[in-house]
Amino acid sequence: MSKIEKKQASASNLLLGAGLNLFETSSLGQPLEVTKVQMAANRTQTMAQAIKAIMSRGGILGFYQGLIPWAWIEASTKGAVLLFTSAELEYWGRRLGLGATSAGAIAGMGGGVAQAYATMGFCTCMKTAEVTRAKQAATGQEVKGTFRVFADLYKEKGIRGINRGVNAVALRQMTNWGSRLALSRFLEKPIRYFTGRTEAEPLTTGQRFVASVSAGALSCWNQPLEVARVEMQSLTKGIQHSSPGIMQTIMSIYKNNGIKGLYRGAVPRMGLGAYQTFVMVFLADCVRGYLAK
């Protein structure tokens, strides 16, 4: 049995992760995020209709609503939270005798929850507000600045106002990263079997990419939580004074839109997961290799 070692999160790795996260969000990440939110908030729209609606809100710039400052704040902080939390939990899980899959699941779940409550709650709330509130211009309502919306939400309900849907975010992140890390570890086993690699031998970048992308796609089974999160944070109808719970929101969506409504936006979300993996696996390794020269 190989020695169990804790994955170290050095300052350089954290800075690299933050930089790559910012690049991912500022390039293709935010357009996929906006498309996903648009489809989840408007569940009768096809993808083509969703893209047309986004384009009507400023052309290409419509795909970057919520990027500054909310997506940048989220991108620059969530990686560090996940790395620290998941590394500790996976290490102690293995120390307590858990297998790689189980320890990976616990590490991912804990890291996802930490992300949600530390930084992602108010960031996702404001990003969703930016995408959904833009439609107010078509109905003749006043279009406020992003910080004015933030102030109004805070004035209405304080910290809870700017963290609407945070429990749904936590559940989504918990199940998403729990599934992704557990499935990644699980999928590494057949890859090692077919390539003849032992447990002590590290997988190649391509092999890890295949395992990560496959795990990311399979992790979209929790899309109902994402649709519920968008519904809870949406400002399509203005600032809501009531705050329905997660299950109440899911049941309402199911009643009005059926099972398909709970999986709206799954395709762009799968694309987002694949792109994030490409950036954080391939580009990260390329940058590390370049800096090591």
UniProtKB/Swiss-Prot annotation:
Chief location category: mitochondrion
Signal peptide: none
GO molecular function: tricarboxylate secondary active transmembrane transporter activity
Stored Pfam families: Mito_carr
GO cellular component, as recorded: mitochondrial inner membrane; mitochondrion
Membrane topology listed for this record: Multi-pass membrane protein
Domain of life: Eukaryota
Swiss-Prot/TrEMBL keywords: Membrane, Mitochondrion, Mitochondrion inner membrane, Repeat, Transmembrane, Transmembrane helix, Transport
Cysteine pairings via disulfide bonds: none
Solcar repeats (start-end): 9-91, 102-190, 203-290
GO biological process per UniProt: alpha-ketoglutarate transport; mitochondrial citrate transmembrane transport
SUPFAM superfamilies xref list: Mitochondrial carrier
Residues spanning the membrane: 15-35, 53-73, 96-114, 169-189, 208-228, 262-283
Gene3D superfamilies hit by this protein: Mitochondrial carrier domain (1.50.40.10)
Keyword Acyltransferase: no
InterPro entries cross-referenced by the UniProt entry: Mito_Cit/Oxoglu_Carrier (IPR053017), Mitochondrial_sb/sol_carrier (IPR018108), Mt_carrier_dom_sf (IPR023395)
Location(s) in or outside the cell: Mitochondrion inner membrane
Family: Belongs to the mitochondrial carrier (TC 2.A.29) family.
Name of the protein in its database record: Uncharacterized mitochondrial carrier C83.13
The species this protein was found in: Schizosaccharomyces pombe (strain 972 / ATCC 24843)
